[in-house]
């Protein structure tokens, strides 16, 4: 059982650094997948089809993704949507995405991913968004979001539990919408319970 005194609240700006993506024209073929905001679905997953590509030139090598890199859409209807990159192929992230880098001795990427799907993240993000008709959640706004950070072993336990529910939700056939909805509600319930750490006075 995690003791509340072991949970620290930090702003994302205190524990992370954020990098905007590479600006280029997407192509139908190339040496790396070009991941755009339209490639992240409503559940924070990478859409497997409709891929676009670019050729990896020297100036875009620093935008190549590694496994467990986190990406967030910063503009448009999908602002705030966060995905975790878990593919084995080369990929570069586009300009309307922000890459989030956290010290892995403080924050496990998958723990953050689950947090970014939840109510606590969205309550804050929706207050920080700007831009009216074209919503923007830029890096400066993102830095202000507060996150509860339990010790790493507790983060690992939370991730293990939530991953099981997430896997169940996404492994069910598309032909069972009622079952999918029930699983999604179950995942959302446990996510909110497991991430509900009262703030220190």
PLM regions and their residue ranges:
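A short glycine-rich beta-alpha junction/loop motif
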Residues: 91-98, 130-151
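Hydrophobic stripe of amphipathic alpha-helices that form coiled-coil interfaces
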Residues: 168, 172-175, 179, 183-193, ...
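Sequence-specific dsDNA recognition surfaces
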Residues: 13-24, 38-67
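Short, structured motif recognition centered on aromatic/hydrophobic residues
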Residues: 7, 12, 32, 65, ...
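Non-catalytic DNA-recognition/assembly elements of restriction-modification systems
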Residues: 1-22, 179-185, 190
């Amino acid at each position: 059982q995690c003791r509340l005194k072991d949970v620290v609240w930090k702003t994302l700006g205190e524990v992370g650094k954020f990098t905007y993506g590479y600006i280029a024209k997407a192509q139908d073929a190339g040496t790396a997948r070009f991941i755009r905001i339209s490639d992240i679905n409503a559940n924070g997953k990478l859409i497997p089809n409709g891929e676009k590509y670019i050729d990896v030139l020297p100036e875009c090598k620093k935008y190549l993704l590694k496994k467990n890199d986190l990406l967030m859409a910063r503009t448009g209807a999908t602002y705030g949507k966060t995905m975790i990159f878990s593919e084995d192929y080369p990929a570069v992230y586009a300009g309307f995405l922000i890459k989030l880098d956290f010290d892995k001795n403080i924050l496990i990427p998958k723990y953050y991913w689950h947090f970014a799907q939840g109510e606590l993240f969205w309550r804050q993000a929706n207050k920080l968004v700007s831009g009216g008709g074209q919503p923007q959640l830029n890096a400066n706004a993102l830095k202000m979001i507060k996150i509860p950070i339990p010790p790493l072993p507790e983060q690992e336990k939370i991730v293990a539990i939530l991953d099981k529910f997430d896997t169940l939700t996404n492994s069910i056939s598309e032909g069972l919408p009622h079952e999918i909805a029930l699983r999604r509600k179950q995942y959302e319930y446990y996510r909110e319970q497991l991430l509900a750490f009262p703030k220190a006075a």
